[in-house]
Structure formats: structure tokens, C-alpha cells
């Protein structure tokens, strides 16, 4: 009889825990973070649920608390890659540069094929202007993932490291491989404009506009090239299109004014 009671108790406990986990997942899916935290705090939570709690805390802007929760998990489970990645994300938000790099590096040591951790590690190096390190890592990453995102990060690192010609060739190779990558088109267009190669900027951006004439980033470089080349009527039309799409940035308004004044 006692065995039956024990089995019933265990079965009931498992059922309640499963129901609670399902409720947590539903609340997370609905971004109802307060409910997530309340449900998890009501029971002795597993590491997986504590990670969900950390995500909820981060979603509510309580990033320091989220990091503390994750650090407790990492003490108990130092090889939990999800907890390590989430801790790195929290450190990034809290401007804890070295700590974030350390967490990403740990994930990369545990799993050298972890593309996301390697990408974020490299991007963090770039954001903190460690361009040489970012270039080295982006080259290594490109051997595993030749996506436009990775190749663009390589080109940006070259640009930051004072390698403008190499970065131009890198952007060109990206555009040939991924013609729809508007960020690379805009970046290369910006380089052409900086070098006063306005014809190159116009040719590049007009080629992209033939498939998508609405992209704000590309149209900014296109309009700027026309303005700096003193083709003011076309520049005005491009800038008017930009402002009609809600672009009220300082440079757009400034060069629209310059174009009007020049005519």
C-alpha cells in the first residue's frame, strides 16, 4: 500500500512539474516575463528553468539579476553552453567587455563549431575597436561559415584596421555572391563616396535599386553621390523619397537643403 501511495505521489509531482514547465513555456512565448519569474520562483527550479528565469529578468531590463542567476548555474554546471552564452549576452548589455569575451571564449573551447558564439565574440572585438583581433577571428570564422554576415564583418574589420583596398575587394566579393546584401552595397557605396568616386557609388547603388528601390541605407549613399557630383535635381528626388519614407536624420535633411540651395 505504501508503495502505491509513493508511486501516486511521485506521479502527481511529475505531472505538476510538467504542467508548470508548460505554463512557463507559454508565458515565455507571450513575453509575459513577470509570470515566468513567478512560476519558476514557486518551485525548486531546474537549471533549464533558471535559464528561462534569467531570460525573463533580462527581458524586463533586470540584467544584473539575470547575470547573477546565470553565474549560479555556471558554478554548478560550468560546461552548460546555454548558460554561458546567456551570461555573455548579459555582460555585453552591462558593458562588461572582458567578462563577455571570457564567456564566449569558454563556449568556443567547449564547442569549436559553435558559430553563434564565435560570431558574437568577433563582433565584440570589432565593436571595441580591436580590429586586428576581429580580422583574425573573422577569417577563422569564414572557414566555417561563409555567410554575408561573417564576410561583411571581415570587410569591416579590414576597414577598421586601415586596409581600405582589401575591404573594398571583400565587399565586392560579398556583393557578387550575395547581390541582395544591401548592407555591403551601402558600405561600399560609402567608401566610394569617401574616395570621391561618385560615379562608382552611383553605378553600384543604381544596380541595386533595379531590384529594390526602397532601401533606405542604399538610397542614402545613392542620393549623396548625386549631390556631391552636383546632379542636384536627381539628388533632390532621392532625398525627397527618403524623407517621404520617414528618414529625418541630420545628414539627409542637410544634404537635401544643400541640393535645394544649389539649384
Question: What is each PLM-predicted segment?
Answer:
Residues 16-71, 75, 79-82:
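N-terminal leader/linker segments that initiate helical-solenoid repeat arrays
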Residues 29, 59, 93-94, 127-128, ...:
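Register position in tetratricopeptide repeats
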Residues 39, 43, 72-73, 106-107, ...:
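Canonical positions in the second alpha-helix
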Residues 44, 78, 112, 145-146, ...:
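Short coil turns that delineate tetratricopeptide repeat
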Residues 48, 82, 116, 149-150, ...:
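Start-of-helix register in tetratricopeptide repeats
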Residues 52, 86, 120-123, 153-154, ...:
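Canonical tetratricopeptide repeat
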